[in-house]
Curated annotation (Swiss-Prot):
Residues reported in the UniProt entry to bind ATP: 11-18
Domain Guanylate kinase-like residue range list: 4-182
Record localization: Cytoplasm
Leader peptide range in chain numbering: none
Function: Essential for recycling GMP and indirectly, cGMP.
Record's keyword annotation contains Magnesium: no
Cellular component terms (Gene Ontology): cytosol
Catalytic activity: GMP + ATP = GDP + ADP
Keywords: ATP-binding, Cytoplasm, Kinase, Nucleotide-binding, Transferase
Family statement: Belongs to the guanylate kinase family.
Name of this protein: Guanylate kinase
GO molecular function, one term: ATP binding
Length: 204
């Protein structure tokens, strides 16, 4: 009945987009969650092929040259990118796909796949965002300062997204994202009317 739908979830570092996406996956096991490739070091608890594909710069640059990314960016000296092939294969199977990427990557996807659904996650406040980043304990002070500057810029330029979700309560934010998925699936452009007619669902 439904075509595969590409959902792009973005937000400042520390806004909680990763946690929200994890909860959505638990509720919707049939969703295809795209795994990004990166050249950054693994953080404690991260698993290669689960959280990211951890590769070296040479391999990443080879993939760029071969046009293997749907989007990619250099973020604070590390490459991040979304491999194109698994995303388009999942969409072709009729699976809905979740991409958790930054705003630069989202803009790239918007140009190449404008029919996607674009969702921006807002933090409760800038001060709480900074507190979350510091609690991580994974970044040096100069990186935290850069992330905060970037957060201001991203929030100031997020009005082109289809949906804005405030993450001041995790369960509410997850419910909001699930409501977005449900509403988008019901839009006429995503419904295959021929299947409805041939299946006898719609009768005169």
């Amino acid at each position: 009945m439904h075509k595969g739908m590409l959902v792009v979830v973005s937000g400042p570092s520390g806004a909680g987009k990763g946690t929200i996406c994890q909860e959505i996956r638990k509720r919707n096991p049939n969703l295809f969650y795209s795994i990004s490739a990166t050249t950054r070091e693994k953080r404690v608890g991260e698993i290669d092929g689960v959280h990211y594909y951890f590769i070296d710069r040479q391999q990443f640059e080879k993939m760029i040259a071969n046009d293997e990314f749907l989007e990619w960016a250099d973020v604070y000296g590390n490459y991040y990118g979304t491999p194109k092939k698994p995303v388009f294969e999942a969409l072709a199977r009729g699976q809905d796909v979740i991409l958790e990427i930054d705003i630069k990557g989202a803009r790239q996807v918007k140009k190449t796949y404008p029919e996607g659904v674009f969702v921006f996650i807002l933090p409760p406040s800038i001060s709480i965002l900074e507190e979350r980043l510091r609690k991580r304990g994974t970044d040096k002070e100069e990186i935290i300062v850069k992330r905060m500057q970037m957060a201001w810029e991203e929030i100031a330029n997020c009005d082109w997204y289809d949906y804005l979700i405030l993450n001041d309560d995790l369960e509410t934010a997850v419910n909001d994202l699930e409501a977005v998925l449900t509403a988008e699936k019901l839009k006429p452009k995503r419904v295959n009317y021929r299947v409805l007619l041939e299946g006898g669902v719609l009768e005169r």
